[in-house]
């Protein structure tokens, strides 16, 4: 099924109707309720003891509420071309005179994805009168190794009281991740390559009075400071020559849904398709036409509720917590062949405790139209908003086999 390219104009599941008793007792969680929940002055909110940026939840709420006006002129078209939004809270930062040094762990950024936009969002308290600063961006997995990505100059003023400062770092990340080069342009200043301790020593020797170095061990930054500095990356997965396994299953169980296993599924499907064509040719030559069209049983869409808490995903999925994926139902005796194409929907269905009758689908009564759903969740230590295709059955119908 073709991938829906318009990320912003997604169709989301409507409020669950006829909610089963097992789910009625649970309190529904909405993006708005999380936004109104307890938070600290650092702009982060808690979920199961883990913190996520306010911006990510606000972005998710704007999308599902279709509030296009709340998106910036840069983010609006970018969302339509993206299927993944990753956020990286700064691991630490230091300010030495007019030099700011920001550290992020960008290990999970994949070069196989097409980078659409990278934004640096700084939401810090007022610094009084405006002054120019040089901002340097580093990638670091730990405090021992630091990789310089690029730098730029900007003016920091009291405007930070009312809003966040947003910088477009797309070219910085693109040049280094794709080309392996640091960006050197007029609006970006090349760093001198000095170690942080050298900068501190230089500032001390000059008797700078405005040096503010936050340390933990050597480079500590309080939660307040770091969590108000985030890097947001918009990307889209590149199309593959071969069909991919379900995106959810591939992320959770890469060995189970490896390329070799996927190739076997594709080959099996091709054999099945070839056998069906041969069977059709035989039937055409040997079976006389029927005078009256055969009456088929009714193929209908029925509820199939998915509760992520019950299948063990509740600790890392922020929203939605539950939804109606639906399934197709009709009287039949033969289940679907295992060589049918795997989808996110079929993967979710395999995890539900359905009876044999509920799990079985007629080969002719199948989903003929699926819709996508966006999910907000943790992926390792990163907070991700990702669009998954083929998650909900929209229409059921008969298919000839």
From Swiss-Prot:
GO biological process, one term: gastrulation
Effect listed in the UniProt record for changing residue 398 to C: Still unable to dimerize
Localization in the cell: Secreted
Glycosylation sites noted in the Swiss-Prot or TrEMBL record: 168, 337, 344
Cellular component terms per the entry's GO annotation: extracellular region
GO molecular function: growth factor activity
Classification via InterPro entries: Cystine-knot_cytokine, TGF-b_C, TGF-b_propeptide, TGF-beta-rel
Signal peptide: 1-18
Annotated propeptide span(s): 19-274
Protein keywords: Cleavage on pair of basic residues, Developmental protein, Disulfide bond, Gastrulation, Glycoprotein, Growth factor, Secreted, Signal
Domain of life of the organism encoding this protein: Eukaryota
A matching Pfam family: TGF_beta
Keyword Disulfide bond assigned: yes
Free-text domain note: The propeptide region and the N- and C-terminal thirds of the mature protein are necessary for neural induction activity. Although cleavage doesn't appear essential for activity, residues surrounding the cleavage site are necessary for activity. The propeptide region is both necessary and sufficient for bmp-inhibitory activity.
Complexes and interactors: Monomer. The propeptide region interacts with bmp4 in a non-covalent manner.
Function, as annotated: Exhibits mesoderm-dorsalizing activity and neural-inducing activity, but lacks mesoderm-inducing activity. Regulates the expression of specific mesodermal and neural genes. Induces convergent extension movements at the embryonic midline by activating the fgf signaling pathway to induce t/bra expression in the organizer region. Acts with wnt11 to induce Spemann organizer cells and induce axis formation. The unprocessed protein antagonizes bmp-signaling.
Protein name, UniProt field: Nodal homolog 3-A
Gene designation per UniProt: nodal3-A
């Amino acid at each position: 099924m073709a991938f829906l390219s318009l990320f912003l104009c997604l169709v989301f599941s409507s409020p669950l109707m006829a909610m089963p008793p097992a789910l009625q007792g649970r309190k529904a969680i909405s993006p708005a309720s999380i936004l109104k929940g307890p938070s600290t002055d650092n702009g982060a909110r808690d979920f199961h003891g883990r913190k996520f940026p306010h911006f990510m939840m606000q972005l998710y709420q704007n999308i599902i509420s279709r509030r296009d006006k709340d998106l910036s002129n840069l983010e609006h078209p970018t969302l339509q071309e993206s299927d993944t939004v990753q956020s990286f809270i700064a691991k630490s930062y230091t300010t030495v005179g007019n030099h700011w040094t920001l550290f992020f762990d960008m290990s999970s950024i994949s070069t196989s994805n097409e980078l659409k936009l990278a934004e640096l969002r700084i939401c810090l308290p007022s610094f009084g009168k405006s002054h120019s600063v040089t901002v340097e961006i580093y990638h670091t997995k730990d405090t021992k190794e630091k990789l310089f990505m690029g730098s730029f100059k900007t003016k920091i003023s009291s405007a930070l009281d009312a809003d966040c400062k947003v910088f477009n770092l797309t070219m910085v990340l693109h040049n280094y991740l794709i080309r392996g080069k640091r960006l050197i342009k007029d609006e970006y200043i090349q760093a001198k390559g000095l170690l942080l301790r050298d900068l501190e020593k230089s500032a001390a020797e000059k008797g700078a009075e405005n040096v503010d170095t936050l340390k933990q061990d050597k480079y500590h930054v309080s939660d307040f400071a770091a969590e108000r500095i985030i890097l947001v990356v918009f990307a889209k997965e590149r199309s593959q020559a071969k069909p991919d396994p379900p995106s959810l299953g591939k992320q959770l169980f890469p060995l189970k849904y490896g390329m070799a296993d996927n190739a076997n599924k594709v080959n099996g499907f091709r054999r099945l398709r070839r056998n069906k064509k041969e069977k059709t040719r035989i039937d055409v030559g040997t079976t006389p036409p029927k005078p009256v069209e055969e009456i088929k049983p009714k193929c209908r869409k029925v509820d199939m509720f998915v509760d992520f808490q019950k299948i063990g995903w509740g600790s890392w999925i922020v929203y939605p917590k539950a939804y109606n994926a639906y399934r197709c139902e009709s009287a039949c005796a033969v289940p679907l062949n295992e060589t049918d194409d795997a989808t996110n929907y079929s993967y979710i269905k395999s995890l539900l405790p359905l009876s044999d009758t509920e799990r079985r689908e007629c080969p002719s009564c199948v989903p003929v139209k699926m819709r996508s759903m966006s999910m907000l969740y943790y992926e390792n230590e990163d907070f991700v908003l990702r669009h998954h295709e083929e998650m909900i059955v929209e229409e059921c119908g008969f298919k000839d086999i």
